[in-house]
């Protein structure tokens, strides 16, 4: 009986291990990126429905809508690139949001502005965003 022994050089084993590790890394990254996109799409759909129900529903009172403006602004800032808007609409929304934030940040005697009049500043922007998500 003769035993044939295959001798692999350490360099060839190292190359094989490196290739295997890189392949595994690419598979893991592909899975993570793919599932991340799916989660983000599901999240976008859920948030857009929530925004449309809140701000597109005439039975929701003005003060409830005003209280939820930060959620609308966060939605727009996160997903503005996904909304089908004309450049003019996008510019109008951005200007209204800037004006809203400037007014909200103004303080009188150390207290920020109160009342529902801030809601009126971005009323047009709200209607454009609601149309875009419906």
From Swiss-Prot:
InterPro entries: Turandot. Its main location: secreted. It is found in: Secreted. Keywords: Immunity, Innate immunity, Secreted, Signal. Pfam families: Turandot (PF07240). One of its GO terms (biological process) is response to bacterium. A humoral factor that may play a role in stress tolerance. Belongs to the Turandot family. Transmembrane segments: none annotated. GO terms for cellular component: extracellular space. This is Protein Turandot E. Residues 1-38 form the signal peptide.
């Amino acid at each position: 009986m003769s035993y044939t022994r295959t001798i692999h050089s350490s360099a060839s084993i190292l190359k094989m291990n490196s290739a295997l590790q890189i392949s595994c890394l690419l598979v893991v990254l592909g899975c993570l990126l793919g599932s991340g996109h799916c989660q983000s799409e599901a999240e976008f759909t859920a948030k857009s429905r929530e925004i449309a129900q809140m701000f597109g529903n005439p039975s929701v009172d003005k003060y409830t809508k005003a209280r939820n403006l930060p959620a609308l602004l966060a939605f727009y800032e996160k997903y503005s690139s996904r909304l089908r808007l004309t450049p003019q609409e996008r510019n109008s929304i951005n200007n209204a949001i800037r004006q809203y934030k400037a007014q909200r940040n103004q303080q009188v005697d150390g207290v920020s502005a109160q009342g529902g009049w801030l809601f009126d500043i971005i009323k047009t922007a709200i209607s454009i965003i609601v149309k875009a998500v419906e």
